[in-house]
């Protein structure tokens, strides 16, 4: 699973005890939280001994009474004992993200800062293609070695 930072929130699916949940990837959350309205009624929960900070005022905070089996978005095996409260969407915290092997990467630019300035001055818009309609190639293509030594510059 991968998600590029954009206007859209990074959400992914997880299967907990055989039930599918969708949640927001939240690297700032220590623990995962399931929305109270999505928590199955027959799954045991208990009043939480600790409160939740950073999600506003949560009057009712519970925690699963059991450690639950979980499959991540790419079927990563994990376990979780989530918190449960009234929030609009589920949050996948670092307790699960670490087990899933989640990474945050910021790739190095494909082009040097100088070439980026030149391209921008000539009207290039990052993420768009080259050309009048901005529909040209969006990523550089790889030069391939001609092992057979045929074609331009080589006798046939």
From Swiss-Prot:
Enzyme class, spelled out: hydrolase
Ranges of residues in domain G-patch: 111-156
One Pfam family of this chain: RVP
GO molecular function: aspartic-type endopeptidase activity; nucleic acid binding
Active site per the UniProt annotation: 26
Record has Secreted as a keyword: no
CDD domains reported for this sequence: HIV_retropepsin_like
Keyword Transferase: no
Keywords: Aspartyl protease, Autocatalytic cleavage, ERV, Hydrolase, Protease, Transposable element
Enzyme Commission number(s) from the entry: 3.4.23.50
Peptidase A2 domain residues: 21-96
Source organism superkingdom: Eukaryota
Catalysis: reaction(s): Processing at the authentic HIV-1 PR recognition site and release of the mature p17 matrix and the p24 capsid protein, as a result of the cleavage of the -SQNY-|-PIVQ- cleavage site
Disulphide linkage map: none
Record PANTHER family: GAG RETROVIRAL POLYPROTEIN (PTHR19422), RT1 CLASS I, LOCUS CE15 (PTHR19422:SF123)
Stated role: Retroviral proteases have roles in the processing of the primary translation products and the maturation of the viral particle. Endogenous Pro proteins may have kept, lost or modified their original function during evolution.
Quaternary structure and partners: Active as a homodimer.
Protein's name in the database: Endogenous retrovirus group K member 9 Pro protein
Species for this entry: Homo sapiens (Human)
Protein encoded by which gene: ERVK-9
